A protein has these predicted regions:
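Short aromatic/hydrophobic "clamp" motif used to bind/position activated sugar donors
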Residues: 108
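Short internal beta-strands
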Residues: 39-47, 136-138
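Conserved donor-nucleotide/metal-binding helix-loop-beta segment in metal-dependent transferases, i.e.
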Residues: 115-148
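Active-site-proximal specificity loops/subdomain of glycosyltransferases
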Residues: 59-100
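A glycosyltransferase accessory/donor-loop signature
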Residues: 1-14, 166, 171-323, 335
Length: 351
C-alpha cells in the first residue's frame, strides 16, 4: 500500500441538501479520532453550494483536512443509465469512482452521510484486506428480514449472510483497478436493472467472495436487533427512513444529536425535524411498503437476474456473452474489442 497509516483518506458522497448530515458524521468522527493521525476528508459531489462548503471547511483542524471533489466528468458516462428511486440519488454511485478518480490511493474508507462514528476510524483503516476488493459488514436487513433475504438469494444468487451493506466500506482501490471493478459495473448496468438496493446489488455481485468481513460494530444499522452491545458500536448507521432528523423517537438518536449540537448547522437540522409533517411520514411508510413489494415482485419474476443467467439469456448489444457453467459457479465471459476478462456474476448456488 502506498498510503502511510498516518494519512487516512475518507470519502463521503452527498448533495447540497444532505451535506449538513455529512457535517454531523464528520463531527462525530473528529470527536473519536486519534491525535496522532492525519485524516483527509473527501466529499464527492456535483452541486454543493459555496456557502455549505465554507461551513464544512471551517471544521478543519490540525488532524483533519477537507476537500470537495466534483464528479461530473465521471458521472457523465453513466448519467442516463442510472435508475433513480425515491430517496436514492446519483450520489449513491459515486463510491464506485473513487479508485479511478484517485489513482494515487491504494486504500480508502467510504462512509455514508447518515452515520455517527463512535470509534477511531484509524482502527478501521488498519485492517489488512489482503486481495479482497472491500472490507465490509454484513447487511442486517437481509439477515433479519425474510423478504429481503429471499430477494438476494432468489434474484442475485447471493446467500443472505454473505451480502454486505455498502454504507461503510474499506475500499481496496488497488484491487478495484487491477480487477476493473468500475468497468464490470458499467458492463452490468445495461444488462439488468436492479431496483431494490441498486448499486449495492451490483457491488455484491462483483465483489462476491472478495470481501474481508469486518466486525459488525463498524456498521451497526438502526434496524431490528442490534448485533452487538451498544457500548461496542463504532459506526452507527441510520438506514432507510430511520433518520433522527425526521423522527424524534428514532432509536439511538441521542448519538446523532450529541454530535449535531457541536456543528454550525444544528439549528437548521432541528428545523428539519420540527417541520417534518405527518404527510411526509406517511410517504415514508408508503416508500417502505413499496420497496418490500419491489423485492417480492423481483422474486416472482420469471426473468429476474438469476433466472436469466441460469438460462443464458442475458444479452448486451455491445458485447458477446457466453455462459460458462460448472459445479462451483456460473460465470459470464465478456469479450470486448479492447480486452477480455471474466466477470463472476453468480456465486456458488445451493441445489
Amino acid at each position: 500500500m502506498k498510503e502511510k497509516m498516518n494519512k487516512i483518506p475518507v470519502f463521503y458522497a452527498c448533495d447540497d441538501n444532505f451535506v449538513k448530515y455529512t457535517m454531523v458524521s464528520l463531527q462525530s468522527m473528529m470527536d473519536h479520532a486519534s491525535k496522532e493521525v492525519q485524516y483527509e476528508i473527501h466529499v464527492l459531489h456535483t452541486n454543493i453550494s459555496e456557502e455549505m462548503q465554507k461551513k464544512m471547511y471551517a471544521m478543519e483542524n490540525a488532524n483533519f483536512s477537507v476537500q470537495f471533489d466534483h464528479v461530473t466528468e465521471y458521472l457523465h458516462s453513466v448519467q442516463e443509465k442510472l435508475p433513480l428511486r425515491d430517496y436514492y440519488s446519483k450520489t449513491t454511485y459515486f463510491r464506485l469512482f473513487i479508485a479511478e478518480m484517485f489513482p494515487e490511493i491504494d486504500k480508502a474508507i467510504y462512509i455514508d452521510s447518515d452515520t455517527v462514528v463512535l470509534g477511531d476510524i484509524a482502527q478501521l483503516y488498519a485492517y489488512d484486506l489482503g486481495d479482497a476488493y472491500v472490507g465490509a459488514c454484513k447487511e442486517q436487513v437481509m439477515i433479519q428480514e425474510e423478504v429481503y433475504g429471499t430477494y438476494v438469494e432468489k434474484v442475485l444468487g447471493v446467500e443472505r449472510d454473505n451480502y454486505f451493506n455498502a454504507g461503510m466500506l474499506v475500499i481496496n482501490c488497488e484491487q478495484f483497478r487491477k480487477n476493473h471493478v468500475l468497468e464490470q459495473f458499467m458492463e452490468l448496468l445495461p444488462m439488468y436493472n436492479f431496483v431494490v438496493t441498486q448499486d449495492e446489488d451490483y457491488l455484491n455481485l462483483i465483489c462476491h467472495n472478495k470481501v474481508c468481513w469486518l466486525p459488525q460494530k463498524w456498521n451497526v444499522e438502526v434496524f431490528g436487533q442490534i448485533p452487538c452491545r451498544e457500548e461496542e458500536i463504532c459506526v452507527l448507521h441510520y438506514i432507510m427512513v430511520s433518520k433522527p432528523w425526521h423522527y424524534s423517537d428514532c432509536r439511538l438518536q441521542e448519538y446523532f444529536w450529541e454530535s449535531a449540537e457541536k456543528t454550525s448547522v444544528y439549528a437548521e437540522i432541528r428545523q428539519v425535524l420540527e417541520s417534518y409533517t405527518d404527510e411526509e411520514r406517511k410517504r415514508d411508510a408508503v416508500s417502505c411498503d413499496r420497496l418490500m413489494q419491489m423485492a417480492k415482485d423481483e422474486i416472482a419474476k420469471e426473468n429476474n437476474y438469476l433466472n436469466l443467467v441460469k438460462a443464458g439469456k442475458l444479452k448486451s448489444k455491445d458485447r458477446q456473452i457466453t455462459t460458462i457453467v460448472n459445479i462451483t459457479e456460473i460465470s459470464i465471459k465478456i469479450v470486448c474489442k479492447a480486452s477480455v476478462h471474466t466477470m463472476v456474476l453468480i456465486p456458488p448456488l445451493k441445489v
